[in-house]
Amino acid sequence: MNVLRFCAAPLAALALMVCTSAFAHDPSEKVTILQDEMLKNVPGKKALMIKVDYEPGQSSIAHKHEGTAMAYVLSGQIISQVKGEAAKTYKAGEFWYEPAGSEHMVSKNASATQPAKLLVFMVLAPDEKVLIPLEH
């Protein structure tokens, strides 16, 4: 019975979030893991390659990565801003680097009418988180 009392409030909040999101447009991007491999020449580290698909107007939440990230715009245009730097628009074929722990304040599709795709390559330890939401 104590377990039920302990879980009731969090479960009710979760149910409310799920019901609310069913009526709202999903603002988050689609992330696809393309490759996830341990690096034999760098003990204790792995390489992760992901594709990020943004629908028109979509954006990521403010976040940071525990690992080093390198991003390449496959199609469309992406607006990216790391804390302490100005926002920059990257076009297809352009790329940038984010040191481990950088706070990524803005990552979004620059277009309200066209989709955009981003290829991200990361190097991190197997127990490090790919994305940590920022509380701002």
Segments predicted by a language model, with ranges:
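Short acidic-glycine-tyrosine-enriched beta hairpin
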Residues: 39, 43-44, 54-55, 84-101
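Histidine-centered metal-chelating micro-motifs
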Residues: 59-61, 79, 96-109
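Bacterial N-terminal signal peptides that target proteins for export
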Residues: 1-11
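A short glycine-rich, His/Asp/Glu-containing loop-to-beta-strand
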Residues: 27-62
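Sec/Tat signal peptide C-region and signal peptidase I cleavage site
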Residues: 20-26
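Bacterial N-terminal signal peptides
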Residues: 9-19
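Ligand-binding loop in jelly-roll beta-barrel domains
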Residues: 86-87, 102-128
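Glycine- and acidic-residue-biased ligand/ion/polar-headgroup-sensing regions
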Residues: 67-85, 94
